């Protein structure tokens, strides 16, 4: 039986049941109006977290969008055909869903964005993708699981999610083994069964004033008696409990880190990872956007470029096959170049990253589209109230000198 800590289950409690949703036979399209930027959501219903569909949406969402060489990444994001695009799978107890999201670029309609997303779903259904991408997806999923399990919160949530969704724990821990046995034919068959291009739910988020908004009068606030002079037996027991003093452990840079020198007296700090089979390598440069604001957009520009011998898609695919990541982040005072992933592939990833940085080639058309997209993204941000609040907070707390 299921239990949580010292809580005893009620054997008389009836098992939850629900009335299944009727099968969808045609597109269900809804429009939401608001001041925020426009976007489109496409969704397909799948089985719940304990069904076979739960495994497939993990794979399919990564085949569509993984940040490097998914169908949406290569065909849309890296070619800047939309401002932003992505796909994800959501697993719940009764049903799951496969979702594709699109943010239109300047001059693009939501219907055009929708059709682009459906075209990529069509490629998946037709098997128009590299079968070797499946093996790379499994390796990257393995890497993601190792990273997640470094945090105690994620370990705890793995138990919680399995418990809430009614997934047998044995099935939960064997997920990676099952995924590794999935073939391209399995993916194509599943996509044709579940991702019908004629049967989906679409939500169009358009700009405008919603005429159906109902204003509610502000109610009179009722005073609340806080009873701060009283305490429950539970609180009293906690307050009376003996607490062992925490003994802090501080990093000793002299003994906990190995320090070395490279050419030109570049300092190297090293610490072996004894927790799992992952690595992280950082190149740190002591200048940033306060030195030159152009570094900010330069890092975004770099992410869209290839070299004289390799396209961006080929480079991203190599990193994905290695289950490694490479990125450049421009901060105010420093620029960070990060390489991370499976430790067994560290040498190959570092070599690939350094060759990429040394041989990257600019593209005027890519830069022009990046500028246009950046301006739209900034204008979209002005439509978001939270973004405006954050900008005001930053403006009032930071002194600008230029």
Give the positions of each predicted feature.
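Single conserved hydrophobic/aromatic residue that forms the stacking wall/gate
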Residues: 1, 402
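Proteolytic maturation boundary segments
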Residues: 2-33, 38-39, 43, 74, ...
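M16 family metallopeptidases and their MPP-like homologs
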Residues: 37-48, 73-181, 200-205, 213-215, ...
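PPIase-associated folding chaperone regions across multiple families
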Residues: 52-59, 77, 186
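Short, Φ-rich (hydrophobic/aromatic) sequence segments
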Residues: 56-64, 159-160, 393
